[in-house]
Structure formats: structure tokens, C-alpha cells
Amino acid sequence: MTVDHAPEGVKSPTGCPVSGMAADFDPFRGAYQVDPSSSLRQARKDEPVFFSPLLDYWVVTRYEDIKQIFKTPSVFSPSITVDQITPISDEALQILGSYQFAAGRMLVNEDEPIHTERRRLLMQPFEADNVATLEPKIREVVNTYLDRVIKDGRADLIGDLLYEVPCIVALIFLGVPDEDIETCRQYGMQQTLFTWGHPTGDEQTRVATGMGKFWEFAGGLVDKLKADPNAKGWIPHAIEMQRQHPDLFDDNYLQNIMFGGVFAAHETTTNATGNAFRTLLENRSSWDEICADPTLIPKAIEECLRYSGSVVAWRRKAVVDTTVGEVDIPAGGRLLIVMASANRDDSMFPEPDDFDIHRGNAQRHLTFGIGSHTCLGATLARLEMKVFLEEVSRRLPHMSLVAGQEFSYLPNTSFRGPEHVLVEWDPQQNPVPADRP
């Protein structure tokens, strides 16, 4: 049911009346897009689980409820996680069909027991020791991009640094050959609006074309990597797992993780790091602290992920009749679980709206999920954020936000990061002599 406003007397599927607050909830515009966690402050207090007629979803806002949903996949299935939240137009479906687009299951939307079997076999490249081997390359790429703007005195952190670098790192991690990185970069950002947004028909048509082209390209890349016995990266590892376990991994599965992996490893890190820089620079004393003492950066990262994470909400489907926060959810009921709201729940985080890099339990945020579906790439994302903050704070500690700028975000339910973060500094004051004009 998709309406701008719930009609008079509308009820949830369980027959309960829908409150005015629930009827007015619109995740595609207004308060949720400005600040999703603050927009649900009243809901956390008065109506922590409510039915949204606009979405046809139950919205869950409190920490403990969301934690239990994550940890009970036998009751709350992840199967709808990457379903389009806005129905796909016939024209867009035809376009996708012309590319033989066949989206299937990936780790993010798989049920047990196959999820755990596949995750165990695909996990090795994500283990901390293996991810750590990428740090010198990440640092090299970050500094290469910083070199391009360091003497200018002004930059857009997103356009000049945070968009490109995570994309390059993601593709290196996946095992994409150097000559294909530029093509992957062009196609890799199609998914957010299409899957989690509210695109118009024209937008669906445009994005479907890009997604179809990338789907074809992803399949060709898998074939290319299969033919290279010396290829390194996550996709070559998955190809080897297919050789050893053909019953668990077919070609469509490999194409799906190539297709989805670019998005998962790229955009979420771009958004998380953009949010972190904005938050730290708006809280100047915290920025100055990490510039003076870089050992504080890991704690600052956890607080940034809690306070303004890039993954705002996930979705689940009730497998059986169940209850969340004393609200009955019928089998088949769909839930939007808003981690951004959970991360501001004062039952878990005292003074939750205060940004505090010394917070003792910031790492208990739910931005990366919890349980068997914890984000597979969390270690890589944290490493990239650490290197970004270390290098920028070392070379541009005097950097500040351009005054008066307005921050914009792509309207969608689940992912959040500023489209631009404009900063400025006096290049004559750059602490590294070689960085001065």
C-alpha cells in the first residue's frame, strides 16, 4: 500500500489502529532524511514498534528489539534485505531482462543453514590478518589523492577523495584487474536509489540500464578471473571455493557477489567516512584531539559509526507469528529495523545525542549488525576509515568545514552519507613543508 497519507481509520494488518505519527512516517523525505535517529526520538519513547501504511512495514526503533531481531534469523528472515522497496516498473523489468539480469541470493539475504555454510567458506579474505596486508596500499592511494589537492586550500572531501579511494580499494580487494577498475567505478553506484529509494519511472529506467550493463560486465569479469590461475582477491577465493564445493556455489552466485560486492565494499565506506569527517569537524574539539593524539582514532571511529553511521536501516520478514516490543507481527510481516535509532537509544547509550569519542561502549553500536549476519567487511571498512583519518589529520589538521554549506543526501531508507563535504585550509600553514605552495 503506497499512499501519501494514511486514510482516516486505517489499521495495521493485525487490526490495530495506526497512530498519527505512524501514518505520517515517510522515510523518503522530511525529518527522516534530515536526521533518521532524531526523527524517531519520540517513537523510541512512545511507540517503539509501529506500522507504516506508506511502506507496508513495521518500523522498529529500540536497541534491544533490533538486537534480538538480528540474533534470531530463524524467526526474522533476511530474505527481503535487497528487495526493491518501491515496486519495479514493467519497463525497468524489461530492460533488466534484456541483460539476462538474474539477481539471486547472496550472504546478506540468505537464510540458514546455507548462509553459515557459505559464509564460513568465503570468510578467509576478510579475516583481520588478511585485511591488514592492504594497509600500505590504502595509505599509498589516500596520499596520492591528497597530493592532488593539498596545495589548493579547498576541496570536496567526497568528490576529491572519499568517492574514488574506497572504490579503488574495494576493487583491489575483490580482485578486479587494473584495466577493469575504471569500468567498475562507473557502474558501481547504481543500486542505492533502485533498491532502497523511491525512484520515478524515468529514474528506474535509467538505473536499470546501468545495472544491466554492470551485470553483464560482472559476469565477464568472473569468467576472466576464472581463466587466471594467479588472480588474487575475494572473487578468486570464491572461484576456488566453487571448485571445491560446486554444490554450494554456482556461476550465478559468483556473478551476484561480484555485482553486489562492488556496492557493499565501496559506497558504505564512502558514506561512513564522509559522515565521520563531517561529524568530527562539526565537533572541533574532538577533531583537535585526534590530530594531537592519533591513538584516539579507533575510538573516534566507533563513536562516529554510532552517532552517524552509513547503514541506517535493514529489513527483515517474520517467518512465523511473533511479537516485537509487545506488538504482534504476523507471519509474512515485513520490518524496517532502524539501527540509526537504536544507536541513539538512551537505555544503551547515556546522553545518546552527545558526540563523545571517549564513550566507553560506543563499539556496541548496531551499524554493522550483530550475530550471524554481522557485516562481513566491517574490518576492512574500519581500516580504511582509520587510514583516512590518520593521513588527513596528519597533513591537514587545520582543515575546517566551509561555513554555510548545506549537506544533501540521496533519499532512501537505508544508506546515508553526504553527497559533498566542502572543506578549506590555509596551504601556507600545512605542517609538512613539501605540502606548501
UniProtKB/Swiss-Prot annotation:
Entry binding sites for heme: C375
Cofactor: heme
Alphabetically ordered keywords of this record: Heme, Iron, Metal-binding, Monooxygenase, Oxidoreductase
UniProt-listed Enzyme Commission number(s): 1.14.-.-
Keyword Protein transport belongs to the record: no
SS bond list: none
InterPro entries for this protein: Cyt_P450, Cyt_P450_B, Cyt_P450_CS, Cyt_P450_sf
Cited SUPFAM superfamilies: Cytochrome P450
Pfam family, one: p450
Top-level EC class: oxidoreductase
GO molecular function: heme binding; iron ion binding; monooxygenase activity; oxidoreductase activity, acting on paired donors, with incorporation or reduction of molecular oxygen
Entry-linked PANTHER family: CYTOCHROME P450 YJIB-RELATED, P450, PUTATIVE (EUROFUNG)-RELATED
Known function: Degradation of thiocarbamate herbicides.
Stated name of the protein: Cytochrome P450 116
Originating organism: Rhodococcus erythropolis (Arthrobacter picolinophilus)
Lineage per the UniProt record: Bacteria, Bacillati, Actinomycetota, Actinomycetes, Mycobacteriales
